[in-house]
Every structure is written in C-alpha cells, then in structure tokens.
C-alpha cells in the first residue's frame, strides 16, 4: 500500500501547514497509517516564521498526488476540490479534518470526516491527540497553536469558538511560549507586504468559491496599515484583472484586514459588483469600501457572498 499524503489547501497558511503536519503524525501514532505531510505551495512569511521558531523543516511541495505514487490522500483545513491538489478527483480521499463549509465535494467510497465549526483545523486535531492519549511534542504543539492563532487572529475573530479559548493556553504551555507575545509576533511576521509584488500579494491567501455558477476568488491580506496597501491600488487592480483573465474568475474580492483594529477594506473587481455590494450593504467607491469589524473570510465574507449570489 502506498503512502497516504496529508495536506492542507492551495496557498497554504499556518493552519493548513500545522494541521496537516500534526494530523500526519497523529495518524501514524494512533492509527498506524503510513502518512506524510506535504504542502500545495510554499509557506508564506507568517508560516515561515512559525517553522523557523519551532525548528521544523517546511513540508515538501507537491503539484500532483498521483505523480508522488499516492493512491489515497487526507485533507486538512479544506474539502472543496477546487482548493485542493490538481488531481484530487483521480485519487481516493481517505479522510477529511476541516472547519469550513462543505461544497464541491464527493467521493466514491465511504471516508472518515471530522468537521467542526471551530476556529481552526488545528483545534480539532489537538482534541484528537487528547482523545487518543498521544503525547504532543513542543514542535507539534507550536504548529497547532500557530494554526489556531492565525485563523482566529489571536482569538479575536468571530470564528473563535469557546473551546478555542480553552485550548490555546494549553497549547501555549506545551509549546513553551507566552500566548499573547508569541501570537502578536507571529501575526506581525505575516504583515510584511512591501516586499511582495502585486501578483504575490493577491495570492498570499486566496481561495476560489463556486457561487451559483460563478468562480469567485476571495483573497485576504493582513496588515497593520490599510492605507499603505491602498497606496498600491493601481498595481493591485492590474494584477487582479490579469488573474481574472488568466483563470476565468467572474469576480475577485480582496480583503485588506487590519489585524490591530479588526476591520477590513474590501477591494473588488468583476462582473457581479451589484451582488458584492448587496452582500455587504455598502457602495464601492473607486472599487473599494470599508467593512467595519470584518476579519474572517469564512464567517463574514463567504456566507454573505453566497447568499447574495444565490438570491
């Protein structure tokens, strides 16, 4: 039997990397599976900070599961096929551990699925470690903690579940870090956007959603200064227009999120701007508008877009 590959979504963030790494280890220890954690892209700057801090080598990057000789895969932090490995339909999905909506997903065989409406996939994996009484090393605790911090913006996001607030201190203790100090340093490491090209910036954390027959790309960048990002609006818009033309997106929505004040500016271009405006009850001026209190793509952007596009 070939090795089972475990990976998060394309354009991996700290939760995609952390949850896949941790679950691959858990699957070996608790279930006796022959697993390897891989990634569908290079770590972003935030995740690179995490890996360096805990002395963990970045997982190798793959573009095809079958090319690796894999017949089975386990997905963490995603389930939608368009967010997964390119040949996902050609291999067996052995299992899924996720905290997102379920869409564009079907399998030929029964599978293991663990889906919970919590702040991160890493939160789920950590509880599975406890359920199976598997010891958590400092490194794995650090990766899971980082995934939780990243996805909940240090427990400030509305996606944060009460259980996330309970396990974060546990993981911080296991990882040997101060939760607040480490969390802020980690998040700030991911806000260095000046060195990024516009093309890189709009692809740091981007996912495609199928909304009523439309392929809508929703990207998010974290910053401590929204105005600084908007100074690059012309080049960002040019990059978005090219991405739309090259990939057949109907619309592109970019969340520029202020991690300090917990607000976002929405920059949007595409064929359905009336639906985008209706989703958030605002008017785009020069292609952008302020969205107070919005920090979560999963809870404060995608559901609203879905409802509007389906109206």
From Swiss-Prot:
Protein name, per record: Probable manganese-dependent inorganic pyrophosphatase
UniProt-listed PANTHER family: BIFUNCTIONAL OLIGORIBONUCLEASE AND PAP PHOSPHATASE NRNA
Organism: Streptococcus gordonii (strain Challis / ATCC 35105 / BCRC 15272 / CH1 / DL1 / V288)
GO-annotated molecular function: inorganic diphosphate phosphatase activity; manganese ion binding
GO cellular component entries: cytoplasm
Complex and partners: Homodimer.
Catalytic activity: diphosphate + H2O = 2 phosphate + H(+)
Cell wall biogenesis/degradation among keywords: no
Cofactor binding note of this UniProt entry: Binds 2 manganese ions per subunit.
Location of the protein in the cell: Cytoplasm
Top-level taxon of the source organism: Bacteria
Keywords: Cytoplasm, Hydrolase, Manganese, Metal-binding
Family under the similarity heading: Belongs to the PPase class C family.
EC primary class: hydrolase
Main location group: cytoplasm
Membrane spanning stretches: none
InterPro entries, per the entry: DDH_dom (IPR001667), DHH_sf (IPR038763), DHHA2 (IPR004097), DHHA2_dom_sf (IPR038222), Mn-dep_inorganic_PyrPase (IPR022934), Oligoribo/pAp-PDE_c-di-AMP_PDE (IPR051319)
Pfam families the record matches: DHH (PF01368), DHHA2 (PF02833)
Residues given in the record as Mn(2+) 2 binding sites: 15, 77, 99, 151
Keyword Metal-binding: yes
């Amino acid at each position: 039997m070939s090795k089972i590959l475990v990976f998060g979504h394309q354009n991996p963030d700290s939760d995609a990397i952390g949850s896949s790494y941790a679950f691959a280890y858990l699957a070996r220890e608790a279930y006796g599976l022959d697993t390897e954690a891989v990634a569908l892209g290079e770590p972003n700057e935030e995740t690179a900070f995490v890996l360096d801090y805990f002395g963990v080598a970045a997982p190798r990057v793959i573009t095809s599961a079958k090319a690796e000789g894999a017949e089975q895969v386990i997905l963490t932090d995603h389930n939608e096929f368009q967010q997964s490995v390119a040949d996902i339909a050609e291999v067996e999905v052995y299992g899924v551990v996720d905290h997102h909506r379920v869409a564009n997903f079907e399998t030929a065989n029964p599978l293991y699925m663990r889906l919970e409406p919590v702040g991160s996939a890493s939160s789920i994996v950590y509880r599975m470690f406890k359920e199976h009484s598997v010891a958590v090393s400092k490194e794995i605790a650090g990766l899971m903690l980082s995934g939780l911090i990243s996805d909940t913006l240090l427990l400030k996001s509305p996606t944060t579940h009460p259980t996330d607030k309970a396990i974060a201190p546990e993981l911080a203790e296991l990882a040997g870090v101060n939760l607040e100090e480490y969390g802020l340093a980690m998040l700030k490491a991911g806000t260095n956007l000046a060195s990024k090209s516009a093309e890189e910036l709009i692809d740091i954390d981007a996912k495609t959603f199928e909304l009523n027959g439309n392929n809508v790309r929703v990207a998010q960048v974290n910053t401590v200064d929204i105005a600084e990002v908007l100074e690059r609006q012309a080049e960002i818009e040019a990059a978005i227009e090219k991405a739309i033309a090259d990939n057949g997106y109907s619309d592109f929505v970019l969340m520029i999120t202020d991690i300090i004040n917990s607000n976002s500016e929405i920059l949007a271009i595409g064929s359905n701007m009336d639906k985008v405006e209706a989703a958030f009850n605002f008017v785009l001026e020069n292609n952008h508008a302020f969205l107070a209190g919005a920090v979560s793509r999963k809870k404060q952007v995608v559901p609203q877009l879905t409802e509007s596009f389906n109206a």
